[in-house]
Amino acid sequence: MNKNKKGFKLFFIFPVIAFGLGTWQVYRYDWKKRLIQRAKDRMEEDPIELSNSFIKNFKGSSFGDLNKYEFRRVYLNGKVIDNQYVLLGPRSIDGTLGYYVISPLQLSDGTRILLNRGWSASTPKSNYKIPYAIEELKLIHQKEKEQGQQQGNQESILYRYFNILGVISKTKERGSAFTPTNQPEKGQWYSLDVDAMADQLNTEPLMINTMDETEINSKPSSLPNPQFKRFDNDVESSFHNKHMSYIGTWYTLSASLFFIYFRYMRKLPK
């Protein structure tokens, strides 16, 4: 009997571990709240101009310092290369599958950065692998190509100029345990990796999330600009913050195990 009691005492370690994990999640929750508040504070600051000189200050390895600019609003203008892109997803919004469309943006000095133009729902005819925005862009360029051929211009315009208001993006996101590994060679991007995407599209490792864009064009296209779900001021949606549920889970488990321990310890013979 003494052996049983001694063995059951070892059970005490499990509720202690669960309590420790719950406490660790409390600290994680507090840390995440500070990150979110810092992002909110940055979003409230006046937008800064994302000039060529700003980009040059972060050339090379110093792009690692961009974390202090994450969630700062910026305004810029440049040439969006419509026919070059990566699709990040699929991501579900309001029960609909879609992708974020990320294209190169070329500034006046030729520097290229990444521009996340926003989320677009997938088309059923593509087996939900291509967003509507890509189909719309193809229609726009096909129309421009036909107009150019009528005017004796055999080249299709595959870029357009925009004024853009956006937010400096984080450079990487951690997916869940079930998120597949990115496969750039197959064009499959399941989680954000700005460095790898920059290599794929030959840009600097800097990405802007578009909040608003206005086309600069003296001869507007006869077709409307593709509709994207843009980024807004809802900063919290950019953070994976489930620490409160983890806190509840671990503390509940700890309390249950403590209850089992003390209840059955009293029943064991001395």
Curated annotation (Swiss-Prot):
The keyword Membrane applies. It is a multi-pass membrane protein. Pfam families: SURF1. It is found in: Mitochondrion inner membrane. GO terms for cellular component: mitochondrial inner membrane. Its main location: mitochondrion. The chain crosses the membrane at residues 7-29, 246-265. It comes from the Eukaryota. Keywords: Membrane, Mitochondrion, Mitochondrion inner membrane, Transmembrane, Transmembrane helix. The keyword Transmembrane applies. InterPro entries: Surf1/Shy1 (IPR002994), Surf1/Surf4 (IPR045214). PANTHER family: SURFEIT LOCUS PROTEIN, SURFEIT LOCUS PROTEIN 1. Probably involved in the biogenesis of the COX complex. Belongs to the SURF1 family. This is SURF1-like protein. It comes from Dictyostelium discoideum (Social amoeba). The lineage of its organism: Eukaryota, Amoebozoa, Evosea, Eumycetozoa, Dictyostelia. The gene is surf1-1.
